[in-house]
Amino acid sequence: MARARGSPCPPLPPGRMSWPHGALLFLWLFSPPLGAGGGGVAVTSAAGGGSPPATSCPVACSCSNQASRVICTRRDLAEVPASIPVNTRYLNLQENGIQVIRTDTFKHLRHLEILQLSKNLVRKIEVGAFNGLPSLNTLELFDNRLTTVPTQAFEYLSKLRELWLRNNPIESIPSYAFNRVPSLRRLDLGELKRLEYISEAAFEGLVNLRYLNLGMCNLKDIPNLTALVRLEELELSGNRLDLIRPGSFQGLTSLRKLWLMHAQVATIERNAFDDLKSLEELNLSHNNLMSLPHDLFTPLHRLERVHLNHNPWHCNCDVLWLSWWLKETVPSNTTCCARCHAPAGLKGRYIGELDQSHFTCYAPVIVEPPTDLNVTEGMAAELKCRTGTSMTSVNWLTPNGTLMTHGSYRVRISVLHDGTLNFTNVTVQDTGQYTCMVTNSAGNTTASATLNVSAVDPVAAGGTGSGGGGPGGSGGVGGGSGGYTYFTTVTVETLETQPGEEALQPRGTEKEPPGPTTDGVWGGGRPGDAAGPASSSTTAPAPRSSRPTEKAFTVPITDVTENALKDLDDVMKTTKIIIGCFVAITFMAAVMLVAFYKLRKQHQLHKHHGPTRTVEIINVEDELPAASAVSVAAAAAVASGGGVGGDSHLALPALERDHLNHHHYVAAAFKAHYSSNPSGGGCGGKGPPGLNSIHEPLLFKSGSKENVQETQI
């Protein structure tokens, strides 16, 4: 297209609008200035508000890299600035006076990855304070005044990887305190000096956690860390962990580094580290350790670096295994490791330089050997094997030749930390001889016992079983679950030094005291110490020839049987008393029933006996009124005038009183009297005596013998 004549500018392409020069000048004059920190585009948004985006950096802050980094440190801020650029990725608000983090303070910072609020005066974080931060990766809140873990404030931080809460006056960590942020990989809870309580479920949900700091929290026990299945680094330094127990690190199979410096640890029990299969570095420096259990580090196949310096190690036979382990693991590094503190002759010596020539050691002694056990299939069972010290290691050999150690698990069978072989549910296939092997630096001692498992009798399943809860247990007293036998045979295999072998003993000792012999192990201890192992042996790998001898003797188990028999006698006495009382009550009831029956029989006989009748003559005038008396007299006159029969013409008046109406008895009496009189004849016979006078009427009254004893007519 040709340019028009006199036109100052070339024509615009088709579809483009032409801006007047005045409009462009107006926009240039009134556009807002760029931020002092680098001219990045920013948005203006008040905390918790919804104002439109601003293009400037906050006045109290400095911005760089196109406002993606905002630094507001040491500006005496009491609140979070309102106009933080929307594209900020790094926000530093450390060393200010911020006290409260309010709801939706950062909701417009969707690209924020690192938020530093450390070294403020934050005492409260409102619910929803971190809403709108889907990209937040690191949240630093250390050196503040928080008294509780702001659990609900972490609701929507789906990408949070690091959380720093160290050096806050937090007093307790409740259950599921961090389950809203399962993405956490690093959690710093160090220097919580007012911490008093950690819930058993405090760390539930942190399945991705790799690093945990609980140092300098005044902990007296290691909290439950089972849920941290992916934990790799654990800091426990600066606490007061006097004792490390077995199971303290249960479930931490991925842990690679464990720091326990300055933790006041004095004792580490046998099998305490058995769960740490992946451990590579262990720091136990600056503690109060004097010795370690035999083969403590043996299960730690990946352990490469161990720090044992600055501990008051007591160098004796218990540290020989450690000397051998150090020679194999860190042969050249002697600066990191233990040096003897006692005895005085070995003070300052590196433990890795010690050997058997410096000590006189003996094989371990089994204080509580296993006993033969008779149980029924399906029951739980235990075979105990305890020593007098925790500096030894305990293993078990099963009937099929499998070696069982603490930590090895066969579904139903396990070795507990005290050396006990535990069966949760025995089967008939478990029957056999089990051997306990106790080992220290000088040798090992074994003791065996037989486990007899009987099948369940379907007929007597509900009754007493072999070794069960009844008195008929096989080979047991009282049939308890222990199934103790009355007598058992102990076979002890010992080592006896041959003549002339004393010359091979180390210098500085005239004669080596004897090792564990039959009298020393079994006879010299408590009476119950020899109660029942089927066999026991002691071996010591010393540089001298030895001849094994066997001694067998029978040991009565008196303490167990006497107690069981005493309990059985008490039960029998109680049973006899109950039976006697029942028999006496039954006898008394029978006697009372017989007596009652006899009394009732006599009463029935009395009732069936007919009553004796009597006749009583009473004066009618006393009983009847005048009208009735006249009627009686007239009737008497008619009778005396001659009737056919005296009994048929004697009409007695109806009496008003029922108890005087006895005319039937009167008629019968008259008939009997005149029939027996020969001079009476026909109808003109004489009347009865006393009836000749109408003025003396008589009436016969009958009554029971019970009421009338004697009557005269």
From Swiss-Prot:
Compositionally biased region (Basic and acidic residues): 703-713
Location of this chain's protein in the cell: Membrane; Presynaptic cell membrane
Residue ranges crossing the lipid bilayer per the database entry: 577-597
Feature: compositional bias, Low complexity: 528-546
Major subcellular location class: membrane
PTM comment, free text: N-glycosylated. O-glycosylated; contains sialic acid.
Residues bearing the modification Phosphoserine: 693
InterPro entries: Cys-rich_flank_reg_C, Ig-like_dom, Ig-like_dom_sf, Ig-like_fold, Ig_I-set, Ig_sub, Ig_sub2, Leu-rich_rpt
Signal peptide region: 1-35
Disulfide bonds: 385-436
Membrane-protein topology: Single-pass membrane protein
Pfam families: I-set, LRR_1, LRR_8
Ranges where the LRRNT domain occurs: 48-86
Entry GO CC: cerebellar mossy fiber; glutamatergic synapse; plasma membrane; postsynaptic density membrane; presynaptic membrane
UniProt-annotated glycosylation sites, renumbered to this chain: 224, 283, 333, 374, 400, 422, 425, 444, 452
LRR repeats: 87-108, 111-132, 135-156, 159-180, 183-205, 208-229, 230-251, 254-275, 278-299
Top-level taxon of the source organism: Eukaryota
Function of the molecule: Synaptic adhesion protein. Regulates the formation of excitatory synapses. The trans-synaptic adhesion between LRRC4B and PTPRF regulates the formation of excitatory synapses in a bidirectional manner.
PANTHER family associated with the record: ANTIGEN BSP, PUTATIVE-RELATED, LEUCINE-RICH REPEAT-CONTAINING PROTEIN 4B
Name this polypeptide is given: Leucine-rich repeat-containing protein 4B
Record lineage: Eukaryota, Metazoa, Chordata, Craniata, Vertebrata
Gene: LRRC4B
